[in-house]
Amino acid sequence: MEDEAVLDRGASFLKHVCDEEEVEGHHTIYIGVHVPKSYRRRRRHKRKAGHKEKKEKERISENYSDKSDVENADESSSSILKPLISPAAERIRFILGEEDDSPAPPQLFTELDELLAVDGQEMEWKETARWIKFEEKVEQGGERWSKPHVATLSLHSLFELRTCMEKGSIMLDREASSLPQLVEMIADHQIETGLLKPDLKDKVTYTLLRKHRHQTKKSNLRSLADIGKTVSSASRMFSNPDNGSPAMTHRNLTSSSLNDISDKPEKDQLKNKFMKKLPRDAEASNVLVGEVDFLDTPFIAFVRLQQAVMLGALTEVPVPTRFLFILLGPKGKAKSYHEIGRAIATLMSDEVFHDIAYKAKDRHDLIAGIDEFLDEVIVLPPGEWDPTIRIEPPKSLPSSDKRKNMYSGGENVQMNGDTPHDGGHGGGGHGDCEELQRTGRFCGGLIKDIKRKAPFFASDFYDALNIQALSAILFIYLATVTNAITFGGLLGDATDNMQGVLESFLGTAVSGAIFCLFAGQPLTILSSTGPVLVFERLLFNFSKDHNFDYLEFRLWIGLWSAFMCLVLVATDASFLVQYFTRFTEEGFSSLISFIFIYDAFKKMIKLADYYPINSDFKVGYNTHFSCACLPPDPVNLSVSNDTTLAPEDLPTISSTDMYHNVTFDWAYLSKKECVKYGGKLVGNNCDFVPDITLMSFILFLGTYTSSMAMKKFKTSRYFPTTARKLISDFAIILSILIFCVIDALVGVDTPKLIVPSEFKPTSPNRGWFVPPFGGNPWWVCLAAAIPALLVTILIFMDQQITAVIVNRKEHKLKKGAGYHLDLFWVAILMVVCSFMALPWYVAATVISIAHIDSLKMETETSAPGEQPKFLGVREQRVTGTLVFILTGLSVFMAPILKFIPMPVLYGVFLYMGVASLNGVQFMDRLKLLLMPLKHQPDFIYLRHVPLRRVHLFTFLQVLCLALLWILKSTVAAIIFPVMILALVAVRKGMDYLFSQHDLSFLDDVIPEKDKKKKEDEKKKKKKKGSLDSDNDDSDCPYSEKVPSIKIPMDIMEQQPFLSDNKPLDRERSSTFLERHTSC
């Protein structure tokens, strides 16, 4: 430890914070020595320089004696309201602030074993509790583990643990290959330091090497070899004078103790299913506590091995042991020993102390870690909380990065968008994105996108080798097919079949497959959108009224629009995306989600109108309800003597032949056939079709409900984790299959999916290629630039807003975005679709969000009680590419797809609309309008923004959304893309209505021109700021620094924090332990 820095305790009260250069070489700099660069800054209050220098000299000359503590305490008491840097915090700063190349410390499994008597005779180590993140206890008499719960500790046990660490043996980075060798080493160290009498070594060794019984083992059925064998307890064995010489006694002890010890894990350990909860590199921390009758003072040892070693059956699971804490004490204090064991086990499961335990260099580092824990611990009044109540683990754990970062001296860790800039509510502004930085060069952004995505091109294919990708393909395929059929049908009605269902299938397949293969963000799904449909209808009517060739006019609009998009790509216009804040994103995505929900119910209501319910039907008068087909009045074909035809023969005969050459029985005609051939439907039941509407709504709501339920099944308590995850991943596919089977079993003739079975244009008046000239006057080619401007705005807004939503920080995408590359391919595909007279395609918000949700990854191993952590999204190109290839092949799968009821697919539409609204802050704020104040959730923005301001912001967002909805439903829908662009202007105007503080929580702060310069200044200020002041402004980026009161544990000590390690007065130590603590 000669190279370790010596820390001047007095320096910590001078409000000095070391910069990175000083911290980097702290092993060779003596902090107490005057360094001009370090001490140029002075305290804010006025003091005489001579007095300050005098105090520094006194501290150095007295070798950091106790007097310095008293002086510092007096000084701190005079300025207690000013932020202080405790010596423990300063020490932890050096421990956690070290930059080494070693990997992060592994996950720890902590096990608490207590020395208990079995059958009143044998003493064994019995496992009573275990920790990974939360505590699990062995239920008394239940032979089962308790549910994971938050460990509640008594404050007294933490102080006793601190005393144990001060007085016991601390052995760091020791080497041992077996448990007997390790126990021997600990006993010898205790004897060398005078903490253990030599004649007690054998007894301690015998006790520590007793058999370990874990909860996974069943009741012990003794074998024949064990019958008659009795092993006395340590006290009786050593108290018997007939045991022979000490040497013989030692041999007997060793042989009997080592019977159950093996360096290899047992079969029960290898079969333990609890290993699934641990990562592969996990290590163990064993805590052994118990009471014995041969010790007068506690036997305390904390050991950290240089390398983790497998110590046989010491641990419940077959993981190597790194830490060992031993506490053996006199009889009568078993409860105190148990609580101390729980305290050290809980500390080892704490992320900050866990890192300190791995990096500690001496006893004082460990004590500083305990002091840091005590600084953060929360105390509950004894009369207001029952400690026997087990606290359920929270759904989301607070990140320890804030605590670690406070000591590491680094910048604020950006996790999931929770930075000071965005107020900790995720979805931060886009000004920091590298993808949105304007290069100022021709096609600079496009070139950077290509360079950024090219290294990941190969991994975009093999990263899809997971069963989760299969479920995503099937789910998105059915959603895409349904959308293509729906849009194709509407487009056919709007354009007189110049573009129909087949064109929709072909365009979706070609555009989507090419985009997913080469675009910057392959997770984005291309589809036709409502605004595009409105534009196509208006364009067709305009061409029809002015005798223009619709497809040629549309071709030139597409070419002009593609050219404008390419100009936007070349000029890096995508940097404007940084002005699309949460307000714009949520307004647009919520509108699209509401459209999906509205269309799903609209289609079901239309279906109910087509197949109405007979509300006047009465069971007692069922003879009054009938329907018959009568022949037309001029000719009565039903009474002819000619041949009568069966209904199945009718479709092959023309109506003319039927009327003049043949006769048939009208009573056998179907409803459609009767109307087709001029018959009359007579009866009061002719307008009603029984059960179809009711069955359709059952399929519709059943598909939606089961999809939602099975998607949430991952967090349920039933079935193993693997089964729950599999059901959740295939939730939508399973729902579709289940209700298709139900529909087939019931046998009601519900409307089914209709897919074109022939590959040819829908209209015979068009081909697969549109000539650019010949159909319209020459000037139409130039005039097409005007409507093309509207299309360009629509394409740009739709594409980039969806791209922003897909690339949100909370999705944790690792391969980067490609805004310019995406828009480039949309423009190229627009040219292709214009020449082939196929629909135009752009990013679809709801389906893209559904695609991302179906590919989300979570941790495979999570501690009991801990929610699986979201790792990111499986970024690849395979799912999207295969979805669109299957869409193109759907023409050949018509015989299979025709069995899928349309209400089932409408239920999938409803699910996608509702699912895409989950987690949207706008929806959370809408719910607040209906909640009483006391029942409102603890959202971060409710802590810092007055509720009336929150409601005002929500009202303005609802107003904009309502205007957009009204606009899209009227003839003025042609300017819909312009109004979406107007959302950005509305958000800019909110800067005059709301403060930047409020907007930083409710929305994103719009980036400023000199933002980078301001951020650099902010970083410099952070380096100069006080380390120990509370960082509550991380939740409140615009709040003022508020002084905090910190009373560090070290001020209360009698011993200097970093003085030379002097031998402890053993008698005084023993007296102190007996009088004040269980240790």
Curated annotation (Swiss-Prot):
Region (Required for interaction with AHCYL1) residue spans: 1-62
Gene Ontology CC terms, in alphabetical order: basolateral plasma membrane; plasma membrane
Principal place of residence: membrane
Source species, domain of life: Eukaryota
Means of activity regulation: Activated by cyclic AMP.
Expression by tissue: Isoform 1 is specifically expressed in pancreatic ducts and acini. Also expressed in parotid acinar cells and in the colonic crypts.
Parts of the chain in the membrane but not crossing it: 961-986
Compositionally skewed regions (Basic and acidic residues) per UniProt: 53-70, 1062-1079
Subunit structure: Homodimer. Interacts with CA2/carbonic anhydrase 2 and CA4/carbonic anhydrase 4 which may regulate transporter activity. Isoform 1 but not isoform 2 interacts with AHCYL1 (via PEST domain when phosphorylated); the interaction increases SLC4A4 isoform 1 activity. Interacts with AHCYL2.
Name this polypeptide is given: Electrogenic sodium bicarbonate cotransporter 1
